[in-house]
Amino acid sequence: MTLATRSLIKNLSSALGAQAEREQLIALISIATQTVAPLWPLDSAIAVNPLSGFEEQPFEEVLPEAAALFGARPTLSLNEWRTLMDEGRIDQVSLRKAVVNALGGPDEAFALLGPDLNAYNLLVARLLDMEAEDVPPVRRALSPGMATLARWLAAFFDRNAALRLPGRERGLYACLSEALRHDPALLRASNATGRAWLENAPADPVDMLILAARRDAVGPERRLPWLRAMVASLPGWAAHLRWRSEHAGPATSLGAPACMADLMALVALVQGVVQPAPRAVPDPDCPEDVEAALLVHCGVAQDAPAKWPEAGRARLRAVAALTHAQLGLIFQEAAESSFLGQLAPQLEGASARLAAPQSTLRPEAQAIFCIDVRSEPMRRALETQGRFETLGYAGFFGLPIAINPACAAPARNQLPVLLSPSHVVPERAMPGREAEATAMLARHAALGDAQAMLDTTKSGAIGFAAAEAAGPVAAVAMLARTLAPRLTHRLRQRLIGERGHVLAPAACNDQDHERHDGQGEGIPLAQRVAYARGMFALTGLSPQTARLVALVGHGGCTTNNAFAASLDCGACGGHPGGPNARLMAAILNDPAVRKGLAAKGVDLPHDTWFIAAQHDTTRDEVEIFDRHLVPASHVADLARFERALSCAGAQSRDERAARLDRTADDLLTGAAHWGEVRPEWGLSGNAAFIVGPRALTREVDLGGNAFLHSYDWKKDDDGSALTGIMTAPMIVAQWINCQYLFSTIDNEIFGAGDKTTQNVVGGFGVVQGSGGDLCTGLPRQSLFRDDGTPYHTPRRLAVIVHAPLQRVQDIVLRHDAVGRLVENGWVNLVVIDPWKHKAHHWVRGDWAVRPC
């Protein structure tokens, strides 16, 4: 709890009267809402830090607190950490440093307790040698009351996947409190007192919470943790509700209004009807028992400590008292140090080489990829094919847009969820392909209608008759998708057509952008120039570009995957980045924009042409868009570039297949197979966000574990470009990193569990089995190998910046969104000094010359 929160509670507690109590509770509800992060729906799923509401506290303090609140594990088990160490993901030197740090420094660690015995030996024994029993998480199954409430929540929030729940227009609390009064399962699970509580519930949710607080004798000082526990009792549904309240458009809530107070009140109502079962709190190792076991392990008599100085006995007690969370954090710090210890010296050497004169030869082509970690292997492979240069930029290419589809569908935001779209860009048929576009949209609509009809047959009274009629057809389709998935996929694509081949964002085929402004669509010339200039400023891309420059968005390609959007571009709101790449390429090829750029000092060569592409991260293939617009003078350049991309894709596919323990050909099959549970590792393994020129990392094999954002500090005099990078893409990368970290630590609570036992609910989320709480994180198959060992190493994001120390420090101190992550240890900030070429690690407000 922050000082500001404590002050608020104290001030409000001193007020008297019902109105003051109500105002206090409303203020606390707002704070308690932050207990969970927003959960985006499946069609625009993005990664978020599930503990983002705790970022104002130090990371090491949050782990046990959040574990207790959500009933989760605070860290991997000691046996899992030992497995990671056996695999070489933690080195001995880094573990030694982490142990010494945990003990307070070398003096404390190596002071003799007895003959040949010190605290360092004791702690290493606890970490590596002594028998370790996995401490179970403090979780409980949903009570009958909570399971019933979860079922009604699914009905209320449903997106037309089932029959409409009557009374939704009255709001979540009013609708469901009435439904619960008549729910037979809930009534059977309650007694007379519970039924009376249910029958006499107040009509207002805040009044309901006040009544429940008084009943449970929850005083003002205890009400915030009490409300947080309400949220944490159904964290998935609470997270969905937070997204709905804070990030969804008004249309989402139309006809079904809901707020977090409604959910808290319903939880309080149900808890009054059916008391939740107490959590089974595991018995932690008794420090005295651990102390005795340590002495036995080290061959020391049990009465020996009585002869030690008090300082020695205190050190023994301190090591024995370390909790499972504290031991796990030592391993985690060692894993982070191992990664940085290997990477930092390589970057220091590369920084020194940057001082030497660089080649002035014009590249054959340049490719600007998304910063996504999956771009790194493809970039590295492409650079081996010839004189190709690659850069990294946020995959929405700096365009704050929403795409208005040509079909009858809502506008789709193509930008980070931290931002709101400034422009709505219409999707239109390419010139001369209007008839083809009309036919393709009709086929898409027919396919959608058929899918809707199929979904309808899966429930309701018509399901039996429909199953009889549709069974033979469905059986043929099932066999085809199972036995020949790639062929089936190609036939399906040929039948319905490739949308990107006949439709495009309007700026890709309209020269007169301004004509859309009266309708609120399109981007005015001045802003198009600004967005184009921003790309050069943030990446450090020289205006002396290659003849061919590719803007490469990315997206995944999977079949029958509820989490498909999580493999698309997070910077594009969980959608493929192709539309943004096409729009930016069209902007940069526009003579009016070129003229505007030249006036601002960005004078592009007359023979430079920008093309748009999309990197399929599941198949390692790159699709080129709008090739019909490429001038005849650049056709040969494009052909050479495509050959290089094909070779790079094959190389990257081989590398990725080895990590998946599969063949490269099997990856192509898996992308089309509806039974594939692991089409790719996604962003598993992500460990670093590196900001600097490509020359800093070009000679380093980062193994697809790093976000790479191009940046040249010499071209950023006022630090504005670096500020933009650290306050937006870096924070998104930290969200991704934390989702992978916590989904690995406890996949049942912070993740989504096993894919094979999941069901989609309401069209927006997944649950395990037939119902219950919404899953908030990543499925097990995205993080763990088939044998159960973690593929992803849980470690905090290493933010590595090649820039002057003072410039980075100013940003950390000036921007709270960055400062709290750095100061509270949610990221490890490392700066490579561009003059002395040394890595400096920010440790609680000061710089250390070597990373931890």
Curated annotation (Swiss-Prot):
<dbReference type="InterPro" id="IPR018752">
    <property type="entry name" value="DabA"/>
</dbReference>
<dbReference type="GO" id="GO:0005886">
    <property type="term" value="C:plasma membrane"/>
</dbReference>
<dbReference type="Pfam" id="PF10070">
    <property type="entry name" value="DabA"/>
</dbReference>
<comment type="subunit">
    <text>Forms a complex with DabB.</text>
</comment>
<feature type="binding site">
    <location>
        <position position="569"/>
    </location>
    <ligand>
        <name>Zn(2+)</name>
    </ligand>
</feature>
<feature type="binding site">
    <location>
        <position position="554"/>
    </location>
    <ligand>
        <name>Zn(2+)</name>
    </ligand>
</feature>
<feature type="binding site">
    <location>
        <position position="370"/>
    </location>
    <ligand>
        <name>Zn(2+)</name>
    </ligand>
</feature>
<keyword id="KW-0997">Cell inner membrane</keyword>
<protein>
    <recommendedName>
        <fullName>Probable inorganic carbon transporter subunit DabA</fullName>
    </recommendedName>
</protein>
<keyword id="KW-1003">Cell membrane</keyword>
<comment type="function">
    <text>Part of an energy-coupled inorganic carbon pump.</text>
</comment>
<comment type="similarity">
    <text>Belongs to the inorganic carbon transporter (TC 9.A.2) DabA family.</text>
</comment>
<keyword id="KW-0479">Metal-binding</keyword>
<keyword id="KW-0862">Zinc</keyword>
<keyword id="KW-0813">Transport</keyword>
<feature type="binding site">
    <location>
        <position position="372"/>
    </location>
    <ligand>
        <name>Zn(2+)</name>
    </ligand>
</feature>
<dbReference type="GO" id="GO:0008270">
    <property type="term" value="F:zinc ion binding"/>
</dbReference>
<keyword id="KW-0472">Membrane</keyword>
